[in-house]
Regions:
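Short alpha-helical segment immediately N-terminal to, or the first helix within
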Residues: 11-12, 25, 121-122, 135, ...
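Catalytic-site neighborhood detector that most strongly recognizes the C-terminal catalytic loop/helix
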Residues: 41-45, 136-161
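Conserved tyrosine-mediated DNA breakage-rejoining catalytic core shared by Y-recombinases
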Residues: 15-20, 24-65
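C-terminal secondary-structure termini that scaffold catalytic or DNA-interacting sites
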Residues: 78-81, 161-175
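Short, polar N-cap/turn motifs at the start of nucleic acid-interacting alpha helices
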Residues: 29-34, 106, 127-148, 170-174
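C-terminal catalytic core of Y-nucleophile DNA break-rejoin enzymes
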Residues: 42-62, 70-97
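Basic, Lys/Arg- and aromatic-enriched nucleic-acid-binding interface segment
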Residues: 1-19, 23, 115
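Short basic/aromatic active-site micro-motif
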Residues: 4, 106-126
């Protein structure tokens, strides 16, 4: 079953986080009444607090019903010596490649690109850099720059914003 691998991948993309951090999530990371994830990122030990959308929240509730008897949100589906443990990064990659192949997706897809894709999509949507940083855990704008890609969508957004401001200026009467 690839269910838990799928959940790890979905959470990484949804929240723009590293696969390694998602595979290690425990139930204590989820604040159910606030629909919020608390995460201390492994790379720099930065804390992020992320909202849990309705669809993902429903998935996590179902996951809790099925796997709530142990610590990890998405452990390996078979216990190792009677204990449920997180997937290794190697196994996440191996099983994800199987899913990619079974789904008929391009083999060059890489899980490590999910975080960069999420950050690029936030930028393309016009999300201010400080808000992107609150999701990604970066502490300065320069560290986010490598994720910011010059895409048609972001150029289109920028020019449309500029043009809408010109229209506003024309419609504003001066004294």
């Amino acid at each position: 079953s690839y269910r838990n691998i799928g959940l790890i991948v979905h959470m990484a993309y949804e929240w723009g986080q590293r696969i390694g951090d998602m595979r290690l999530l425990t139930w204590n990371n989820i604040k159910w009444k606030d629909k919020q994830l608390y995460l201390e990122q492994s790379k720099k030990r930065r804390e992020v607090f992320l909202p849990i959308g309705d669809d993902l929240f429903s998935m996590l509730q179902k996951q809790k019903e099925d796997f709530g008897f142990q610590d990890y949100v998405a452990p390996q589906v078979r216990p190792a010596r009677g204990v449920y443990v997180p997937y290794t990064l190697t196994n996440v990659s191996k099983y994800s490649n199987c899913v990619i192949k079974l789904a008929g997706l391009r083999q060059e897809l890489q899980l490590m690109h999910l975080r960069a894709t999420a950050i690029t999509e936030m930028n393309d949507a016009g999300v201010p850099i400080n808000q992107i940083m609150s999701v990604s855990g970066h502490v300065n704008p320069q560290s986010v720059q490598p994720y910011i890609k010059h895409t048609f969508k972001s150029a289109n957004f920028a020019l449309n914003q500029r043009n809408s401001n010109k229209t506003l200026d024309k419609n504003t009467k001066s004294c």
